[in-house]
Amino acid sequence: MTESAAAWRELLDTLRELDTSFLEGPRAVTDDRQIADGYRMLATGLGVALDCYLFPEPGRPQFVAVNTPTRHDRRWGGDNTDAYYHMCPIDPERKYRVFGNKGDSVYLSLTAYNEPSPGAWSNKVVAIIRDTDIEFDADGNF
């Protein structure tokens, strides 16, 4: 079996077991609506993971909306009607130029997090640039 095939099967096995987090044990739900919400949450997490880690091109990274108040498939970890979060995995060996427009944002930052081991959640901020560190032109471009 190829490494890709093994990884795919491992993903499917993991997905197959994830619903036990809300179907079994002391936090189990029985209401159809709550069960549907659990599956919706799993699908949302999978969608974010695929968009952030499977589809990006390392040579041309793009920011992916991972939490917005308007996309229902990108509302996870708690709603925040005032914030938009984007993610962009990068190669620590490369340099990047980020440009955009701050729009009507009250606060804007670019934050880099570590990856303690492949696939692990970050546990440390390794760099941050806040809007007070960025030069904007008259139209809000940077």
Which residues does each predicted region cover?
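A compositional/structural signature for long, glycine/proline-rich flexible linkers
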Residues: 1-142
